[in-house]
């Protein structure tokens, strides 16, 4: 998941699950820990992108899941930073506007209204199962 906050700071995080909520309107949800660096940049009406990674992007998944590497996530040229930051070579990019935020104990449930998407023709999606990438 990636976004840009109202101060112009780029944020990205690896999420373990993205869930479809509705087809009409098209929407999905992710759950973000309240201690995550990206958490406070997520507001109703703000935009974000879900980047579904391909199998050769294991390194970016690890980078975006490491607190110690938070400042290094946007180095290099793999990101398109023109508007909402997204990974150029991802399997798919799903662009959303935050529709609703639900606080639940340690996490915030983020419901996003899908506004646009793009995907690669060849399916080569990175998955994480039983503690390892596949």
Regions of interest found by a model, annotated:
Residues 1-134:
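Basic, polyanion-binding surface patches
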């Amino acid at each position: 998941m990636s976004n840009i906050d109202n101060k112009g700071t780029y944020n990205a995080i690896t999420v373990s699950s993205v869930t479809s909520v509705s087809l009409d309107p098209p929407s999905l949800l992710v759950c973000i820990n309240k201690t995550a660096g990206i958490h406070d940049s997520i507001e109703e009406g703000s935009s974000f992108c879900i980047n579904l990674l391909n199998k050769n992007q294991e390194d970016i998944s690890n980078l975006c899941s490491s607190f110690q590497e938070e400042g290094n996530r946007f180095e290099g040229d793999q990101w398109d930073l023109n508007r909402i930051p997204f990974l150029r070579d991802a399997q798919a990019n799903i662009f959303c506007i935050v529709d609703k935020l639900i606080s639940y104990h340690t996490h915030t449930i983020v419901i996003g209204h899908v506004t646009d998407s793009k995907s690669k023709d060849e399916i080569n999606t990175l998955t994480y199962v039983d503690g390892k990438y596949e």
